[in-house]
Regions:
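Conserved phosphate-binding/catalytic loop of the ribokinase/pfkB sugar-kinase fold
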Residues: 1-10
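Conserved beta-alpha-beta core of the PfkB/ribokinase-like small-molecule kinase fold
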Residues: 13-82
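Conserved phosphate-binding/catalytic region of the ribokinase-like
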Residues: 34-38, 53, 81-189
Length: 189
C-alpha cells in the first residue's frame, strides 16, 4: 500500500475514508499521513472519532464529520447549524485546515481555512436513499474546489452532490446535481 501511495505526485488528492480493515493497524491513517507529509498533495479524511482526531496533527486539507460524529468526539449533542460551529472550530484548532459538517435534513456547515463559515439548509427534495450521500458531498466539494479554488463554490457543489445522491435511488446524474446547484444559487440571491 505504502509503495503505491509513494507514487502520488504534487497536486494529487488522497481520500482516506471509512473504517480500517481488521487486518491493518489501527493507526493506518496516521501512518499514511505521516508518510505523505513531504508531498504537496491534498488529503481528505472522512472517518469517525479516533481515526479522525489522530490525523489532525498532520493538517488534512478537509475533514468531513457529520453532526453526530462531531458531537461524539466532544461528548455533546449537536442538532443545529449554529451549534456545530464552535466544535468545528476546535477541530480546526487541532489541525484540520477545512471542516465540512454534514447534517442530513439540517443542511451543512463549512468552516474554511480562510476563516469564513459557510452555512446552508438542506436542499428541497424527497429523500430516497441516504447511503453514500456523505461520500458524494465530499467528492462534490473536492470537484468544486479543484475547478474553482473557491470555498463557497466547493461547499455548494458538495451540498448539491450529496443532496442529489440522497434524492436518487443510486448515484445522482450530473444533470440532477446541476439542477440542485442552480436551485441553491437561485435561492441565495
Amino acid at each position: 500500500l505504502m509503495e503505491h501511495l509513494d507514487r502520488l505526485e504534487d497536486g494529487d488528492v488522497l481520500f482516506l475514508a471509512g473504517s480500517i480493515p481488521a487486518s491493518m493497524p489501527d493507526d493506518m491513517y496516521s501512518r499514511i499521513m505521516e508518510r505523505m507529509q513531504h508531498k504537496n498533495i491534498e488529503i481528505v479524511v472522512d472517518a469517525t472519532r479516533d481515526l479522525l482526531v489522530n490525523v489532525l496533527k498532520y493538517h488534512p486539507f478537509l475533514i468531513k464529520p457529520n453532526n453526530h460524529e462531531l458531537g461524539d468526539i466532544f461528548g455533546v449533542e449537536l442538532k443545529t447549524r449554529e451549534s456545530v460551529i464552535p466544535y468545528g472550530n476546535r477541530l480546526r484548532d487541532m489541525g484540520a485546515r477545512n471542516v465540512l459538517i454534514s447534517m442530513a435534513g439540517e443542511g451543512a456547515v463549512l468552516i474554511a481555512e480562510n476563516n469564513e463559515v459557510y452555512k446552508a439548509p438542506a436542499s428541497k427534495g424527497k429523500l430516497v436513499n441516504a447511503v453514500g450521500a456523505g461520500d458524494s458531498m465530499v467528492a462534490g466539494f473536492m470537484s468544486g474546489w479543484i475547478k474553482s479554488h473557491d470555498y463557497e463554490t466547493a461547499f455548494l457543489t458538495g451540498l448539491a452532490c450529496g443532496s442529489a445522491s440522497a434524492f436518487s435511488e443510486y448515484l445522482a446524474t450530473g444533470k440532477e446535481v446541476e439542477d440542485i446547484l442552480n436551485q441553491m444559487k437561485g435561492e441565495s440571491k
